[in-house]
A protein has these predicted regions:
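Residue-level recognition of alpha-helical structural elements
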Residues: 24, 43, 68, 95, ...
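Activation on extended, non-transmembrane soluble regions of large proteins
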Residues: 44, 337-341, 516
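Short, low-complexity cationic-aromatic patches
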Residues: 174-182, 322-333, 342-360, 560-570
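Extended, noncatalytic alpha-helical scaffold/tether regions
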Residues: 2, 6-319
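Long, K/E/R/D-enriched contiguous segments that form extended
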Residues: 274-282, 306, 310-340, 344, ...
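Extended alpha-helical "rod" scaffolds
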Residues: 240-251, 255, 259, 291, ...
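Short, hydrophobic/proline-enriched secondary-structure or compact coil segments at domain edges
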Residues: 180-199, 203, 354-374, 574
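Intrinsically disordered, low-complexity domain-flanking/linker segments in eukaryotic proteins
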Residues: 203-229, 264-275, 319-323, 382-431
Length: 683
């Protein structure tokens, strides 16, 4: 039984093999008939499909007779010759449909390598003809050089996109698209390098920069003349920036297509392009970028020198009011914004970082040192100068000037006209009168304007960087942009220093005014004395008058925010002065005297508080003094327990007085006995 089953199995296998063989022979016959028909009709696409089917049948070990094999080989040779001729004709005729149709035949015919080589050779020859300069590079003008360089970049992009569908659809197995990109890049790069080198040489950028850096500095009366006749570097900078921008756009296009092709490729090998740093084109572009940064440095330096030489006092709009500032601020920020935005627009990371660093250095060092020197001189200038009331009158009170002022809206976009009838800086010596441009309000307004411009510049550059570079931004660009934030911190600290300098000049004036008055003031009052004080205030009204004399000129000329900062600094001085003169060495107080002190402190605090809208800084400055007054005004010592240790002024100011200080204040009240005070338990 087992033997019969085995025999039956062998019979079945032989029958199955015979059927498969017969089927294969029939398929061979049918394919050969279709192949002959297609070749007769010159339908090479279907003929290639039939030939591929015959090769697949042959791979299954199905015997094909010698005659059929000869006919297959002959058909294959005929198809290759035919499609190569037709492909060449279609390429020269720019027949896109025919190129795609014929390209689809190479893969089934198993000679995609020959096809892609033919296409690449044609593309390379055509590209070389299109990119070749019409004459010697030495004879071309600057305009012709830049135009031809842009033509090179655009032609490479056009050829790549034109043949991309063919390479992806028909030659994917042999990395056709990647090889096309590498071939056109290698053909175009030497031409682009020669054009860039010729442009750099013909422009003479290196010599130009060298001469500009070694120009002798003008002195004396020639400074303004030299500044007015200074070279305008912007046209050349714009031209170089455009060249860099085109080169980087081209490089990004090539690298992006390479990444796209590699993502579609089944081959695990790397890119066929040379690395970015090893590219000869990138080497030339880096040289141009270095020269561009050096030229931007020359432009920034020249513009800054011009701004310093032609400095004047200008008015700008601030909250519907005109405030005086130094013209240096507008000039420096104008060139800084132009240079930084131009550098970002190139799309070249190194060039952008280089110029951003130059701008940061200009703002953090050069401009900062100028303003810092003026801040340091504030105390001396204030002591030597006359009253500020008439110092800036010509600028702020002139109706004719107000009509000529153009409002500065945003940084760099609407600059104050150079034809302003502004007050020019007078020549000064160490003992001369205060120059208007060096007046404290001008210095303070200039710092405030710098902070405002820095914020605008930061926002502008961040937006331009996002437009010029891919998201996320390169780390170097982020780092350079953060330098503006560091500069802002430095100017904020400088503004605080300026405020403290002015307050330190006010402090001895206020102290010398208050000390004689307070020495004669008594706070152990009778009813008659208290009533008399209602008519003739002991010191508060006089102190407010003195503060008004000091602050009114600043209020007239300072920006609102800057003036409020100044008032905050003066408030601290006034509060500490009153606390020191009144409460350090306590005089006797009775109930009426404590009420009188509370009224006087309220008058002074209200005057200063109205200037700053009673902000938190104001409440904190008067916090200790007000808490002392609260302790002095209690009806009985036990009333202290109702507020001791709790925040005051609607929770803005924490309790600042220790238990010992509270006891000292209570002991100053003539009505309270030692026993009553000792009975209080302060935690």
């Amino acid at each position: 039984m087992t033997r019969e089953v085995r025999l039956l199995g062998r019979v079945q296998e032989r029958v199955k093999a015979s059927i498969e063989r017969s089927d294969g022979i029939l398929r061979v016959r049918q394919s050969m008939q279709r192949l002959q028909a297609c070749m007769h009709e010159r339908n090479y696409k279907d003929a290639a499909a039939c030939l591929k089917e015959l090769r697949d049948i042959e791979a299954l070990s199905i015997p094909i007779d010698v005659g059929d094999k000869l006919r297959m080989n002959s058909a294959e040779n005929d198809i290759r010759d035919a499609i190569e001729r037709q492909m060449s004709a279609a390429l020269h005729a720019k027949d896109e449909a025919a190129v795609l149709r014929l390209g689809s035949i190479f893969e089934p015919m198993l000679f995609a390598e020959e096809g892609v080589s033919m296409v690449l050779a044609f593309v390379a020859s055509q590209l070389e003809e299109r990119l070749a300069p019409s004459s010697s590079l030495q004879r071309l003008s600057i305009h012709d050089l830049t135009s031809h360089l842009i033509h090179v970049f655009n032609t490479v992009a056009e050829v790549t996109l034109r043949f991309e569908p063919l390479m992806l659809q028909s030659f994917g197995s042999v990395r056709g698209a990647e090889r096309l990109l590498s071939r056109v890049y290698n053909v175009a790069s030497p031409i682009a390098v020669r054009l860039l080198d010729a442009y750099i040489a013909q422009r003479g950028l290196a010599d130009l920069i060298h001469k500009a850096r070694h120009l002798p500095d003008a002195t004396g009366p020639n400074i303004k003349v030299a500044a007015e006749n200074a070279v305008d570097w912007n046209p050349q900078l714009n031209e170089v920036a455009v060249v860099l921008q085109h080169s980087q756009t081209y490089e990004r296009f090539v690298r992006a297509r390479d990444v796209f092709y590699m993502a579609r490729s089944s081959s695990p090998t790397g890119s066929l392009l040379a690395s970015f740093n090893a590219s000869p084109l990138n080497t030339s572009v880096q040289e141009l970028a270095a020269l561009y940064c050096a030229l931007e440095d020359v432009c920034l330096s020249a513009s800054t020198k011009k701004a310093l030489a032609t400095e004047e006092m200008r008015s700008i709009a601030s909250h519907s009011a005109l405030i005086p500032v130094s013209s240096i601020i507008d000039e420096v920020f104008y060139v800084a914004r132009n240079g930084a935005c131009r550098a970002l627009a190139t799309g070249h990371v190194d060039a952008a970082c280089g110029v951003l660093n130059l701008v940061a250095t200009l703002l953090e060092t050069t401009l900062y040192d100028v303003i810092k020197s003026r801040v340091r001189a504030l105390p001396r200038e204030m002591r030597e100068a006359g009253p500020l009331t008439g110092l800036l009158t010509n600028l702020q009170s002139s109706t004719q000037l107000r009509d000529q002022i153009q409002t500065i809206a945003t940084l760099g976009k609407k600059m104050t006209s150079r034809n302003l009838n502004s007050t020019p800086p007078a020549s000064t010596n160490a003992s001369g009168p205060l120059t208007p441009v060096l007046a404290p309000p001008v210095t303070l307004n200039s710092i405030g304007t710098i902070l405002s411009y820095l914020a605008q510049l930061q926002a502008t550059l961040e937006a331009d960087a996002m437009a010029a570079f891919s998201d996320p931004l390169p780390a170097h660009i982020k780092s350079c942009l953060s330098g503006l934030q560091d500069a802002a911190k430095g100017y904020k600290a400088l503004l605080e220093t300026a405020m403290s300098h002015i307050a330190s000049v006010f402090q001895p004036k206020l102290a010398s005014f208050l000390s004689p008055i307070l020495k004669k003031t008594s706070f152990d009052l009778t009813d008659a004395m208290f009533a008399a004080n209602e008519v003739n205030d002991p010191f508060a009204a006089s102190l407010v008058t003195q503060l008004r004399l000091l602050l009114d000129p600043y209020e007239e000329h300072l920006a609102r925010e800057t003036f409020e900062q100044l008032v905050d600094a003066v408030t601290v001085v006034v509060a500490e002065l009153l606390e020191g003169l009144l409460l350090t060495k306590l005089v006797p107080f009775n109930q009426l005297g404590a009420m009188q002190l509370e009224k006087d402190v309220r008058v002074v605090a209200n005057y200063l508080g109205e200037k700053v809208q009673f902000n938190h800084a104001h409440h904190r400055a008067f916090g200790t003094l007000r808490q002392c007054v609260m302790v002095l005004n209690v009806d009985v010592p036990d009333d202290v327990l109702e507020f001791y240790g709790r925040p005051t002024t609607r929770g803005v100011v924490d309790w600042k007085l220790g238990a010992g200080r509270v006891i000292e204040l209570l002991q100053a009240r003539v009505e309270f006995t030692t026993v009553e005070i000792a009975a209080i338990e302060l935690a």
